[in-house]
């Protein structure tokens, strides 16, 4: 479970809920909360709740502008260092924004260099085109879809695929052996359908072929990580939030062919 599932709750509460819901591990989204950047504190939480930290999500620019400074390359390097320090093997990163000129022009080289020096997999995440007044805006560079990029590891997010009008199953098939990581969620439609929000629905509540994708990966003995990244901010209580998280766990275990707890 990604700690972003219960944002803005404190990090320890995220670990508690992940444990109560029945998840096997945690992805830590680096935010303004100091605990998300403190390897010692994170290891203590991992030990306390018996949940390994599987991955680190590098800071997202729009939410964490000044976390670890303003240089996006430094942010990615620090994320890899944090991953190594807490025993995670993967860092999830979004493609650069076009206005991050030096970073975007050298992004794939930077990713490969950090992977080589740190031993951490950098899973570049699929995003979606931005639109303004019905027109596409080139917000990302090299782009929003890493399908054909020269990188060794990618992350598949179903909500992003939905907003982009793509099929998560087709993306998984196209990514092939480069698919390292999955953000388990769903979406109900694309921007062309009038959808404007990145929904991160409970899997099975949208229109993406999430079940089919998990079953496809299970059939080929895929060994990456499936990490829940659903939006529970509308939950009126922890009980309601926990219900959504447990539903997500059951969905994943069912379609991956794993025994439910």
Protein language model features and the residues they cover:
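Acidic-and-aromatic substrate-binding clefts and catalytic sites of carbohydrate-active enzymes
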Residues: 4-11, 28-41, 61-72, 97-104, ...
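Active-site clefts of carbohydrate-active enzymes
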Residues: 189, 199-201, 223-237
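An N-terminally biased module of ancient metal coordination in phosphate/nucleic-acid-related enzymes
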Residues: 1, 16-25
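Acidic (Asp/Glu)-rich catalytic clusters
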Residues: 15-20, 35-55, 74-87, 108-118, ...
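Acidic/histidine-rich catalytic cores of soluble enzymes
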Residues: 114-207
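Hydrophobic faces of well-ordered beta-strands that scaffold small-molecule active sites
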Residues: 1-3, 26-28, 53-58, 91-93, ...
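Conserved radical SAM core fold
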Residues: 59-64, 188-192, 196, 235
């Amino acid at each position: 479970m990604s700690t972003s599932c219960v944002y803005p709750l404190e990090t320890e509460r995220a670990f508690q809920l992940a444990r109560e819901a029945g998840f096997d591990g945690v992805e830590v989204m680096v935010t303004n909360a100091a605990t998300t950047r403190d390897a010692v504190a994170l290891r203590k939480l991992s030990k306390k709740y018996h949940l390994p930290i599987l991955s680190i999500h590098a800071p997202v620019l729009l939410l964490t502008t000044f976390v670890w400074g303003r240089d996006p390359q430094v942010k990615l390097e620090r994320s890899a260092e944090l991953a190594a320090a807490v025993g995670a093997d993967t860092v999830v990163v979004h493609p650069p924004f076009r206005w991050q000129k030096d970073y975007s022009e050298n992004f794939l080289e930077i990713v490969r260099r950090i992977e080589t020096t740190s031993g951490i997999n950098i899973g570049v995440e699929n995003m979606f085109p931005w639109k303004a007044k019905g027109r596409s805006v080139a917000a990302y560079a090299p782009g929003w879809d890493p399908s054909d990029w020269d990188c060794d590891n990618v992350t598949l997010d179903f909500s992003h695929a939905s907003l982009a009008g793509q099929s998560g199953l087709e993306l998984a098939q196209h990514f092939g052996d480069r698919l390292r990581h999955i953000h388990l969620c769903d979406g109900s439609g694309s921007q062309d359908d009038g959808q404007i929000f990145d929904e991160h629905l409970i899997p099975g509540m949208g229109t993406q072929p999430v079940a089919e994708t998990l079953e496809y990966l299970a059939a080929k003995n895929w060994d990456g990580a499936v990490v829940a990244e659903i939006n529970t901010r509308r939950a009126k209580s922890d009980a309601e939030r926990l219900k959504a998280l447990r539903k997500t766990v059951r969905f994943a275990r069912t379609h991956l062919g794993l025994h439910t707890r």
